[in-house]
Amino acid sequence: ELFKIVSLWPENRFVLHRLANYYKSKKNYKKSIKIYKRILKDHQSSDRDLFLYASNLDKIGKWDDAKVLFFKLLEKNPKDTHTLNYVSYKLALKEEELGLALKFIKKALMIDPENGYFLDTLGWVEFKRKKYNSAVYFLEKSVSLLPKSSEVIDHLGDCYLKLNRKREAVFEWKKALKYETDKATVVKIREKIN
């Protein structure tokens, strides 16, 4: 059905967005990137289009290229909370520029202090900085706002383990398994439990 619509309106931005999102949902990031390139050639493309293009680049391992685009977005709009969060979380995952990651996520939380995803990122940045007590505080708050997020729950379990709170860690990991759908992630969580 979607492909039929695309054949009828191949240059319609709304249709192209739907197609790009379809490919992204199927983890076909390269096709999604090609479509976002077409969208970005349009004079009416938005910052959101650039964000989605950059996040797809990141998904195929082109973090350095994506990072340049994310910083361009932040230069244009320093209060773009989603970009601040994305970059902060990615820096934490890569364990690089943790001071900058902390600065960015704190800025996002000043704008949206009750955002569970942002609190998770702050918790994860603190975890990577080995500030485990601080990390637990933010991760517990994040879990209270996102009680079915397997990723956030898993992060909390990891943090409990670092604080030698093994029983609580296992409890959180078992809870995370209830909500996790990705098979590879399920295997990783089960390995932690065992």
Please describe what each predicted stretch is:
Residues N21, S55, Y89-K90, W124, ...:
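Residue-level recognition of tetratricopeptide repeat
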